Amino acid sequence: MKETIEFLIDTVEARQVLDSRGNPTVEAEVFLECGASGRAIVPSGASTGAHEAHELRDGGSKYMGKGVLNAVNKIHETISPALCGLSSLDQIAVDKLMIEIDGTPNKSNLGANSILAVSLATARASANALDIPLYRYLGDPLSNLLPVPLMNVINGGAHAPNSLDFQEFMLVPHGVNNFSESLRMGTEIFHSLKSLLDQKGLSTAVGDEGGFAPNLSSSEEAGDLLLEAIQKAGFKPGEQVSLALDAASTEFYSDGIYKYEGKSLNSSEMISYLSRLVSNYPIVSIEDGLAEDDWEGWSELNKELGNKVQLVGDDLFVTNTERLRKGIMEKSANSILIKVNQIGTLTETLEAIELAKMSGFTSVISHRSGETEDTTIADLSVATRSGQIKTGSLSRSERIAKYNRLLKIEEELGNQARFAGALGLGPKNI
C-alpha cells in the first residue's frame, strides 16, 4: 500500500536554467504524492560524439539558438501527464515509458535533455521519500567504494582556447588510503602547477573544466610540467600519482587521417605515438586515443596497449550498450566512459555499467564540460562501485561540488568507506 500511494508521481515541473558555460539547460523537479520531491539538472558537452542521444535546442536568436524552452514544454505537456500515477520506485518503468513516448532511436522527439532531467529527478525523489542518500538508493549495502579521481588539470582541444590538440591531461592520485587524502594530494599538485606556470610566464587562465589552459608546444611539454608539479608538491610520479590522457581524437580526425600537432598521421602512426607516450610517462589511462568510428584502429590500439593501460571509449561508446557490445566483440578497448546525458536515462546508464562489468571492462563515471551544481554523478560512482570518476580540476564550483559530495559520502560511510586507489582498483596498473 505504501508503494502504491506514497511513491506515486504527482507532477513534474521543469525550468530553463544555465550551465557552467552560460548556456541554457534543463532542470526537472518530480513531486510525489507523499510530499517528497527530487530535482536534477542535466549537463552538456562541448566535444560531443556523433552517436550521442539528441539534445533538444530551440534555435532562433535567443541564447544564440541554445535555449531549451521547447524541452521544458515537452516535460510539462507530454512527460508529466504520462508519468502521473506511476511509482517513482519503478525507475525502469518510468524510463521505459519516456523512451516509448519519444519513439526515436536517439530521443530526438522529446529530447535526451528533457528525458534525462526527469529520469534523474525521479531517482532523487525516491531517495528523498525513503530518507536515504542517493548512492544508497541506487546501490546496495556494499556500495561503499570511493573512486579514484582523474583530475583534468591541463585543458586543451575543444575545452580551451590554446594550442594543445589533446583535450585533457589528468592527475590520478591513487597512492593513499582514502579519498580525502587523494583529493588533498591532487589539490596540492594543482597549486604547485599554477606556481610553475607563473614562474615560466605561462597563462594560468582556466578552461571549461577548471584546468589551466597554457599555450604549450606539445603533449610532451604538458606531461613534463605535470611530472615537475607532482615532484614540486612532494609526491612520487607513478608511485603515488600517475597520469591520464583524453586525446579526444575525433576532434582532429578526418578521412582516415589524424591532424595532430601539424602532422598527418594514420591510425598505425597514431598508435605508435601513444605507445611512446606510455613508455616515457607514468600514464595509466588513455581516453579516445583514436576516433569514434576508427574501429579497426581501436582493435590495433588494444592489441598494442590494452595489457599496459586503461583504454577508455567515450565518443567510441557514448554510454550506449549496442556500441559497447560491438567494442567487446571486436576487442576495441577495455574501459567505457559513462556520461548520463550521452544515452539519456538512468536505466540505460546502469545497463551500460553492468554490461561493462560483466565483460571485464572498467567504468569511469564522468561529468561534461558544461556542468552544473548537480552532484548526481558523485553518488552514481559510489552506488555502482565504478572505482573511478572524472569531474574536472580543482577550481570552478561546479567541479568542486562533486568532490565535496564525495567527501561527505566518505564521512557518512565512516569506517565502512573504502578507497579504490588503496585497493589497487581504478585505472590499469596502479
Swiss-Prot record:
It is found in: Cytoplasm; Secreted; Cell surface. Its EC number is 4.2.1.11. Keywords: Cytoplasm, Glycolysis, Lyase, Magnesium, Metal-binding, Secreted. GO terms for molecular function: magnesium ion binding; phosphopyruvate hydratase activity. It holds the Pfam family Enolase_N. It is an enzyme of class 4 (lyase). One of its GO terms (biological process) is glycolytic process. (2R)-2-phosphoglycerate binds at residues 167, 339, 368-369, 390. The active site is at 209 (proton donor), 339 (proton acceptor). InterPro entries: Enolase, Enolase-like_C_sf, Enolase-like_N, Enolase_C, Enolase_CS, Enolase_N. It catalyses: (2R)-2-phosphoglycerate = phosphoenolpyruvate + H2O. Pathway: Carbohydrate degradation; glycolysis; pyruvate from D-glyceraldehyde 3-phosphate: step 4/5. SUPFAM superfamilies: Enolase C-terminal domain-like, Enolase N-terminal domain-like. Catalyzes the reversible conversion of 2-phosphoglycerate (2-PG) into phosphoenolpyruvate (PEP). It is essential for the degradation of carbohydrates via glycolysis. Belongs to the enolase family. This is Enolase. The gene is eno.
